[in-house]
């Protein structure tokens, strides 16, 4: 089959049987299109440019002055009047005209070079109105006016043709400055124009033009098409305008300034921000955004963020914990207030209130709601978030194995499997020794060891007098029970198969923890260190287990400020007359020595003397702990 007969899909046979491909019909048509392409595409552009009339048409309208209808018909289109005039129009404007009211003077005025810029600001149809033709005697009285592009209106005001539209503000200033002088000169010019005296009129107009040029009022003149006002009306306006401006400008301005000065204090951002309620009270987004709820603090979650100055105070208190523990204990309430409830420190209704323990405890109650949001990133505020130190404490803390099988509740945030590691995890003590925690009875020993290590750390770094003050601070709780200890009666199961030497070793190792844990224990009140809820049997009171401290993840437990916050924020007045030291202090008195007291003996001691000899119990436990070591 011939290759010339084979057709390719989608392409016509351009080189069909032609020896020269350029002779094919399609090649010929394509060459023609290429040749005609630039011209054909340039024609629409030329047509767009030729939409305005050509100079020949303008010459016809200027030369043949008798054809007024044609100029009127074409004058309706703005393009005719906006086009650039030719030189012939200016020469025709200088030719002598018999009468000023003739059609020649009218056409000469409309199509002169100086009138072109004036007509740009108004529709051309206005020039052909009968009212405009009736006023030709007044507006164009002589040839020299057209030559100088100056017209005089019926009110006797001199107007330069080709100026910008006349604004009221410029009119008022113009009338205020040259009121009497211009009226006198305009009346003389108007009388001279009626007498048809070109030479005298020329001198007057030249002098007036020079005066107006010096005063720079060329751009603020009225238009000829504007309806002329009567002289009496203009005089009234001239006399009223200065009084209006003088009497109203300064008092209004001063009154506005006074209003602004008086209205600035209530409109200041701090006052408006203080009265603004939280946009989303119980959502987890506002914890990150830093909204401060100032209303309904008892029902909404505590979502305030601490300012930079608050952070500096908290950091300085943390740094001073190693050197001086008395100042830390004295500032415990301040740290609690700054850490968990900055609304007490920052809100407007609490700025004047003293930072008392009762106010801090009331604010600490709302801190529980913050942990029920379910977002682990929202457990701590970004303001107190010293994240490298927190992560270091998480990785080096010896308390990571604490995870109790308590039923989930609204406060049980750290339920098993959520944040806590497995139970059989190894706990690094001092970075060298490893102590494997078992589930059978080790929980209560670890709690006791933490409390004793706390007391021992405080006692070893201070004098006996300071020790007494610290123990008073630790042992005197507020008259309400903590949420962690829901029942008043505590029955502790006896720990099986564990020797006293192992218990004492746990006590000793618990004391040698990292600096962050030591600081945390130094700031932690002993009222919050108790056995978990699954070791309790409640006789009355709330049945929901509330050991929030050890159910929380290790990020909260190992940060000093957050630990201080959690120890104070979970206190709720459920059962008056009971305290946490009822369960913790007698345990220190009897359990480490191995007296073998039954749980009922502890209950009896709690019932008989709940608040007596708290300092003696702490001292006795401390001495026995040191003797065992």
UniProtKB/Swiss-Prot annotation:
GO biological process: G1/S transition of mitotic cell cycle; regulation of transcription by RNA polymerase II; traversing start control point of mitotic cell cycle
Bias kind Polar residues: ranges: 21-37, 245-260
Skewed-composition ranges (Basic residues): 1-11
Residue span of region Disordered: 1-60, 83-106, 217-286, 455-485, 586-629
Regions of compositional bias (Low complexity) in chain numbering: 261-277, 455-475
Ranges of compositional bias, category Basic and acidic residues: 614-629
GO cellular component: a single term: nucleus
Modification after translation (UniProt): Phosphorylated by CDC28.
Positions carrying Phosphoserine: 268
Keywords of the record: Activator, Cell cycle, Phosphoprotein, Transcription, Transcription regulation
Function: Activator of G1-specific transcription factors, MBF and SBF. Promotes both the timing of G1-specific gene transcription and cell cycle initiation. Associates with SBF- and MBF-regulated target promoters and this binding is maximal during the G1 phase, prior to maximum budding. Affects cell cycle initiation by advancing the timing of transcription of G1-specific genes. Overexpression advances the timing of SBF-dependent transcription and budding. Depletion delays both indicators of cell cycle initiation.
Subunit structure: Interacts with transcription complexes SCB-binding factor (SBF) and MCB-binding factor (MBF) at their target promoters. Interacts with MBP1 and SWI6.
Identification of the protein by name: G1-specific transcription factors activator MSA1
Classification of source organism: Eukaryota, Fungi, Dikarya, Ascomycota, Saccharomycotina
Name of the coding gene: MSA1
